[in-house]
């Protein structure tokens, strides 16, 4: 009997090991980054800091998310982002603000840089939406905090869906990337307009 059990366990182990090399490969995706910043003086004499981008737990992990109903979200096991969506967003935002040439400097909060203004945000949605038409949904909100006065001086909310041109995961990624780019450009334009209307160092 014990011999039979040992043979059965050995057979199961062999079957398990034989399947180890035949698993489906994991595919990783990322978003496009802006061009490097031009070496020109910033329009605004502001050292801008980009703070935390908070998000629900599903957006703090790498599997690409999809929504099948108003209350149900799942993730793809073999299709993932190279970084969690909130990190991808933050990195692209910093690069975009640097590339704009609007600021004296743009750095991540907690770095050696110091600044009066902190831009922080929250990511609400970053997923494929499966309905009559497949779409890439992004919802996010940002606020500009003045460390000197202790007040939020500007905020912006963005929520848009981008049609997915195809049924492949790569098409979903492209739609989310396009949507994110559009949303962050809105944020950058709104920030620039705030500082144009409220020049730093002038009463």
Regions found by a protein language model. Give the residues of each.
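Generic short beta-strand segments
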Residues: 53, 122-126, 159-160
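Sec-dependent bacterial lipoprotein signal peptides
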Residues: 1-18
